């Protein structure tokens, strides 16, 4: 019986339709080699487990109880020259085509149709609380791709693509902020990424909850047409006793994602080409200090996060 599987690797999805339940995990890896060029011994397939343990190569696919078109994430690097591995990743339209949001804010932020969409998300979107909100803490909302790790470069493990100082950053932030992850992908991939990076299991901090693309809304802008955004109003509507405009900050490498809440957004520099930039990227180290400084404030509304480095430099010079 044919068992169609979808494998995600290097920012692309590959459809596997020629294997059956009698084929083995090694057969799957051999087939993926023809699609991706990654040798079987270099492949790590996330989510293929038997009795809670990673499936060995000789395990038959039928024993994994996979549903048709199950999506699997693959980690692994091609056997190619280091120069090729370090080459530029595919163009990311979200980064290249991002635009300055300031001109569009007035027309979008308070439009009734957009506020109604947020109200629907507040009512209908189900949030799985991983750790209860803490009284008196501020809120830090974090994007994933290009913010916390480089999701386009190739590597054997997610840790190789992790942004430098990630765990130190989250540990420090957790002292003053509840931490929420919000990615424009689906929850399965978010959970897999957080597990691979060691975020969801770290003992030094806790994630309050995670949001996926289903919590986003589509808005119409005069110049850019329809775009998807991350409205913080969804969080504020669901957790109004804890979070508001006054105590929330959101990091994202794509400025338009906080088009509905520009006052609360900080556009972080994207972390790309991890192999080249791992030793040079200090963004999270500096932002750790910024979060610590503004945590002293009762109200974030007087801040302009666009100039966060200037603010930090001024405070540290006092």
UniProtKB/Swiss-Prot annotation:
GO molecular function: metal ion binding; proteasome regulatory particle binding; protein serine/threonine phosphatase activity
Entry-linked Gene3D superfamilies: HAD superfamily/HAD-like, Phosphatidylinositol 3-kinase Catalytic Subunit, Chain A, domain 1
Residues annotated to bind Mg(2+): 143, 145, 253
Name used for this protein in its record: Ubiquitin-like domain-containing CTD phosphatase 1
GO cellular component terms, semicolon-separated: nucleolus; nucleoplasm; nucleus
CDD domains per record: Ubl_UBLCP1
Cofactor requirements of the protein: Mg(2+)
Coiled-coil region: none
EC number: 3.1.3.16
Entries under SMART domains matching the protein: CPDc (SM00577), UBQ (SM00213)
Organism: Homo sapiens (Human)
GO terms under biological process: negative regulation of ATP-dependent activity; regulation of proteasome assembly
Annotated gene: UBLCP1
């Amino acid at each position: 019986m044919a068992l169609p599987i979808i494998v995600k690797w290097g920012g692309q999805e590959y459809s596997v339709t020629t294997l059956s339940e009698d084929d083995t995990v090694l057969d799957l890896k051999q087939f993926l080699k023809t699609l991706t060029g990654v040798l079987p011994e270099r492949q790590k397939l996330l989510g293929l487990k038997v009795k809670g343990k990673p499936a060995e190569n000789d395990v038959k696919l039928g024993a994994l109880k996979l549903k048709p078109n199950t999506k699997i994430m693959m980690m692994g690097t091609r056997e190619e020259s280091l120069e090729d591995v370090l080459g530029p990743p595919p163009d990311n339209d979200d980064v290249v085509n991002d635009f300055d949001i300031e001109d569009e804010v007035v027309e979008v932020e308070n439009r009734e149709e957009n506020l109604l969409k947020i109200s629907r998300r507040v009512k209908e979107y189900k949030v799985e609380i991983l750790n209860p909100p803490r009284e008196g803490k501020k809120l830090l909302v974090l994007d994933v791709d290009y913010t916390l790790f480089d999701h386009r470069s190739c590597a054997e493990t997610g840790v190789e693509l992790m942004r430098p100082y990630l765990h130190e950053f989250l540990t420090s932030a957790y002292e003053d902020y509840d931490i929420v992850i919000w990615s424009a992908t689906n929850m399965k991939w978010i959970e897999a990424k957080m597990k691979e990076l060691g975020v969801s299991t770290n003992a030094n901090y806790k994630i309050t909850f995670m949001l996926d693309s289903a919590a986003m809304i589509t808005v119409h802008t005069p110049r850019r047409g329809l775009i998807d955004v991350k409205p913080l109003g969804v969080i504020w509507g669901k957790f109004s006793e804890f979070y508001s405009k006054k105590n929330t900050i959101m990091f994202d490498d794509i400025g338009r994602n906080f088009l509905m809440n520009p006052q609360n957004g900080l556009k972080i520099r994207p972390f790309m080409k991890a192999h080249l930039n791992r030793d040079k990227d200090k963004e999270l180290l500096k932002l750790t200090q910024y979060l610590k400084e503004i945590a002293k404030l009762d109200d974030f509304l007087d801040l302009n996060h666009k100039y966060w480095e200037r603010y930090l430099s001024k405070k540290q010079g006092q």
